[in-house]
């Protein structure tokens, strides 16, 4: 009898170990890749990746333990068994559905692109714009901040338009790895930045840099495609034939939650804006040239309207549009100094350029370069050697 009692107790312990282990595992599986207290400030990506990609093995082990002790525990502690089974199921559901990134933020079910005459987006709204050949397209940040990624084809080129509202990072990529087309899904975040998982290897890719940070492809990057951020009104002034991504009616309520995001009035502590300079959530404009990064204070750019500088040995010019939300960055030609803003034109002496960098005269064009508006904490984290323009 003593042996049977001890054996019965041991089997019951298997159930408790399995149930509690499964609950804790599901909690940790979410904790490291979602914005939980402390989770996004730790260097835990390798552990998070291991747990996530070992989830089938861990779940099988814990479920096996539960199965071994289920009947003995059911006979003597039925309500405890029911509660733990319910909590285990709830933890599994929350981890895989309720708190899974790709079940919280969906890609559009329908993708409508409208010309200016049929557009429903306000002229004051911020967009991420791309051009390929003669075709221009604009993607309102209010919309892509919810979706996190929108796949589109612009003049035959497949592009992945991405945005992370917690870092305020807009990037456009060609969804390919080593020249082969790839499919990505939103999987979570690391250091507050969205992460995507590729379909072939399950590697995790950072939205802000396009670099794989975990998995077989760690260290590789997907090609970035040039994009510019400005108000829709400014974009259409430069590209009147552009088509504009329209709201998907299925997600109208989701978009409403981001209605004031453009102006920095986020509804949560994750998306709010610091109005002072160089605080965690202050806006900066970041530039990278020749692998050298530099950040420029948004408040200073608004005040001075233009900043002429050298980054990585490259002379650059950053200017603010008259709407105080559109900004532009150019690589400068030699022998041109004294640039000034004249409405929405650039002038140096008697030469004038539009905000695409074109000039009707014989002067060299101003070559647009990628520049990014984002939170200071994001730029500093993903460009650890960055300089600051003082």
Give residue spans per PLM region.
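Mid-to-C-terminal functional-domain signal that highlights helix-capping/loop sites
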Residues: 7-390
């Amino acid at each position: 009898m003593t042996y049977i009692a001890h054996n019965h107790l041991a089997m019951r312990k298997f159930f408790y170990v399995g149930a509690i282990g499964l609950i804790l595992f599901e909690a940790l599986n979410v904790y490291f890749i979602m914005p939980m207290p402390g989770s996004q400030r730790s260097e835990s990506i390798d552990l998070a990746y291991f747990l996530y990609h070992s989830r089938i093995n861990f779940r099988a082990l814990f479920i096996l333990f539960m199965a071994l002790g289920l009947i003995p525990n059911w006979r003597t502690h039925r309500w405890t068994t029911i509660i733990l089974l319910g909590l285990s199921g709830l933890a599994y559901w929350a981890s895989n559905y309720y708190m899974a990134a790709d079940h919280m933020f969906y890609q559009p079910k329908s993708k409508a692109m409208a010309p200016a005459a049929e557009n429903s987006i306000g002229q004051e709204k911020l967009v991420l714009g791309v051009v390929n050949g003669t075709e221009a397209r604009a993607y309102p940040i209010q919309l892509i901040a919810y979706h996190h990624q929108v796949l589109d084809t612009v003049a035959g080129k497949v592009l992945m338009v991405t945005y992370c509202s917690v870092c305020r990072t807009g990037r456009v990529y060609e969804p390919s790895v080593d020249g082969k087309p790839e499919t990505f899904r939103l999987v979570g975040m690391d250091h507050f930045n969205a992460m995507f998982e590729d379909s072939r290897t399950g590697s995790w890719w950072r939205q802000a840099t396009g670099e794989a940070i975990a998995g077989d492809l760690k260290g590789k990057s997907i090609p970035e495609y040039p994009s510019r951020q400005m108000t829709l009104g400014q974009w259409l002034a430069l590209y009147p034939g552009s088509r504009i991504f329209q709201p998907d009616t299925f997600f109208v309520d989701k978009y409403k939650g981001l209605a004031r995001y453009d102006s920095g009035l986020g509804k949560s502590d994750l998306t709010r804006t610091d109005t002072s300079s160089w605080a965690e959530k202050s806006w900066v404009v970041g530039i990278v040239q020749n692998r050298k990064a530099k950040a420029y204070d948004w408040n200073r750019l608004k005040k001075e309207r233009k900043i002429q500088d050298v980054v990585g040995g490259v002379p650059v010019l950053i200017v603010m549009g008259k709407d105080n939300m559109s900004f532009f960055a150019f690589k400068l030609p030699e022998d041109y100094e004294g640039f000034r803003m004249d409405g929405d034109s650039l002038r140096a002496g008697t030469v004038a350029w539009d905000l695409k960098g074109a000039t009707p005269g014989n002067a060299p064009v101003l070559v647009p370069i990628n520049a990014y508006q984002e939170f200071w904490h994001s730029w500093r984290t993903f460009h650890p050697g960055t300089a600051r323009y003082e």
